[in-house]
């Protein structure tokens, strides 16, 4: 498609027959919108439901395919030279449509290609879409109002892409070409999508090759219209579009998909005929001819026996053999009967193919140049799959039960369907085998894991038993030691108590002795006054002693009470400390058990099949 500024004289391409001059004629130029408006949002949304769909270019159905420019026109009535086969014109036009056209060589312009290229200061392109910013407005730079997007853009990009799209482009790596600044953002979006998302027909795309030019705001629903646009673009930025088509096709091929969505049907091809079924003899049989040997004395023909015929073709697993007999004996016609199954038919067909490969099949047997005897006198056997006519010929002289029973059945029903069923059964069998193998592996793994865990548990229990026994021994030792210490201190306390009691007894004796001395000193000698004074003195001494004894007993009671209180306090402190020790031991044992607690065995789920 060409823009309004590139309309060609006569309304058709040069060389098409519509324009006698075949040159270029500039009719008019239209003012292009600012690049900011054209490319605004181009890379922001890749799937806009409100965007208008891309216009599809109509295809010509006249049998000739026209390239843009001065390309040749191939008519459908052109015939190839004798002896040189060529594809039909329709196929050639399809190939030409799917292939990138060659570079178009047009007539030179009057002033050459010296068009004014707009200059922009460096760094004025945005990072997201590569669009010019406010400092580089196409309307202000192009004061005359000409549309330079079709001409200058191609001219500018020809220099920019000269290193990427020249004759050496095929030698560049795919990644290098894909990372070009024009396509990098587009392919980054592609890589972020899954295959299902790529094939969504409702996903809309902008053409990265049309960036900053006509068609930049067009939407293409799905990758197929975008690929068609890139392959058929024939007037502006051809190299860029062909490169995009090549890269997109390679990228989709590496992702394992194509631009044609799965399930889309064009119905433009002729396939096989609707039915390929045929009737076959059932059970499968192979007719073996020339099995006659010689005539006996009664002029009756003798021939090969049943087992001998089976032995001759033992590689093909025939189940039975029968021979045809007539009034003159053996008729030289025999059949090998195979199992009534698809495998039996495949064996019969394999034997038939063997006869065909060594040219001893039906056609050779029916020809006038068949060889019945080989050098040395041996007879050459011929064979082929049995047909209804063959079976009727075989049963010509047979009546009643001697007739070889057969029936005509559908090939698809008896062979194809059974083979498909066998294939499905085989797949199911393989699936079940793999599942069983996985289950056995899983069971083996569980068994090994259980064995390891059981062994570790057994070892742990043995270690715990040893530790427990050692702890009991230590506990007994500690109890024995504590008992010894307790007895020792009890003995010491008893000694102290006995010493105290002895001291009290001595103290009481001393008091009694002193009192007795005082009483003995009371004699009747002396005057009455002296006796009275002595009695008073003795009485005072006794009273003082009694008073002193009472004070002693009171203080003794206080000391004993204080001692008992201290003992109670000490016992409380001891019990509290003992309780703290037991609590610390319990905490330490709990922490130790948590540390050495065995892992909980969890049986893994059945492996996914």
Swiss-Prot record:
Residues 49-58 have a biased composition (Low complexity). GO terms for biological process: defense response to virus; regulation of defense response to virus; regulatory ncRNA-mediated gene silencing. InterPro entries: SGS3, XS_domain, XS_domain_sf, Znf-XS_domain. Residues 1-102, 116-174 are annotated as: Disordered. Pfam families: XS, zf-XS. Belongs to the SGS3 family. This is Protein SUPPRESSOR OF GENE SILENCING 3 homolog. It comes from Oryza sativa subsp. japonica.
């Amino acid at each position: 498609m060409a823009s309004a500024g590139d309309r060609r004289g006569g309304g058709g391409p040069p060389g098409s027959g519509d324009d006698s001059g075949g040159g270029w004629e500039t009719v008019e130029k239209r003012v292009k919108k600012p690049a900011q408006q054209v490319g605004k949002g181009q890379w922001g949304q890749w799937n806009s439901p409100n965007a208008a769909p891309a216009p599809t270019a109509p295809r010509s159905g006249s049998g000739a395919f026209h390239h843009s420019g001065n390309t040749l026109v191939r008519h459908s009535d052109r015939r190839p030279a004798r002896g040189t086969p060529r594809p039909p014109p329709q196929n050639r036009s399809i190939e030409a449509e799917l292939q990138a056209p060659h570079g178009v060589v047009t007539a030179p312009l009057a002033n050459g290609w010296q068009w004014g290229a707009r200059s922009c200061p460096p760094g004025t392109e945005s990072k997201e879409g590569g669009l010019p910013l406010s400092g580089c407005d196409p309307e202000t730079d192009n004061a005359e109002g000409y549309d330079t997007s079709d001409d200058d853009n191609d001219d500018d990009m020809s220099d920019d892409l000269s290193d990427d799209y020249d004759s050496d482009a095929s030698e560049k790596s795919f990644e290098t070409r894909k990372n070009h600044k024009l396509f990098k953002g587009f392919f980054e979006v592609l890589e972020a999508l899954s295959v299902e998302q790529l094939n969504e027909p409702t996903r809309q795309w902008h053409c990265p090759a049309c960036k900053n030019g006509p068609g930049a705001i067009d939407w293409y629903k799905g990758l197929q219209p975008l690929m068609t646009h890139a392959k058929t673009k024939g007037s502006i930025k051809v190299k860029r579009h062909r490169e995009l088509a090549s890269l997109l096709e390679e990228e989709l091929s590496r992702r394992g998909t194509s631009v044609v969505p799965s399930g889309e049907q064009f119905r433009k091809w002729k396939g096989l005929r609707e039915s390929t079924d045929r009737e076959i003899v059932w059970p499968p049989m192979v007719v073996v001819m020339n099995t006659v040997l010689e005539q006996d004395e009664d002029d009756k023909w003798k021939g090969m026996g049943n087992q001998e015929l089976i032995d001759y073709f033992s590689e093909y697993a025939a189940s039975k053999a029968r021979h045809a007999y007539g009034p003159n004996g053996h008729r030289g016609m025999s059949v090998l009967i195979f199992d009534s199954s698809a495998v039996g038919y495949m064996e019969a067909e394999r034997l038939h193919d063997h006869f065909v490969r060594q040219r001893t099949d039906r056609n050779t047997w029916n020809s006038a140049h068949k060889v019945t005897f080989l050098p040395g006198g041996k007879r050459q056997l011929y064979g082929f799959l049995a047909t209804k006519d063959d079976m009727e010929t075989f049963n010509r002289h047979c009546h009643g039960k001697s007739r070889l029973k057969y029936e005509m059945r559908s090939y698809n029903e008896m062979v194809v369907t059974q083979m498909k069923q066998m294939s499905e059964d085989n797949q199911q069998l393989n699936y079940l085998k793999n599942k069983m193998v996985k289950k056995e592996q899983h069971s083996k793994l569980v068994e090994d894991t259980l064995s390891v865990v059981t062994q570790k548990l057994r070892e742990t229990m043995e270690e715990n038993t040893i530790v427990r026994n050692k702890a009991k021994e230590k506990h007994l030792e500690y109890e024995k030691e504590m008992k010894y210490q307790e007895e020792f201190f009890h003995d010491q306390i008893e000694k102290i108590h006995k010493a105290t009691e002895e001291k009290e007894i001595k103290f009481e004796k001393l008091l009694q002795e002193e009192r007795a001395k005082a009483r003995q000193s009371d004699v009747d000698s002396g005057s009455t006054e002296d006796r009275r004074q002595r009695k008073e003195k003795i009485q005072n001494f006794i009273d003082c002693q009694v008073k002193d004894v009472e004070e002693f007993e009171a203080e003794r009671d206080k000391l004993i009470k204080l001692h008992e209180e201290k003992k109670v306090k000490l016992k409380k402190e001891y019990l509290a400390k003992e309780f703290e020790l037991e609590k610390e031991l319990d905490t330490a044992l709990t922490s130790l058990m948590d540390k050495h607690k065995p892992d909980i065995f969890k049986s893994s789920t059945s492996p996914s099949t």
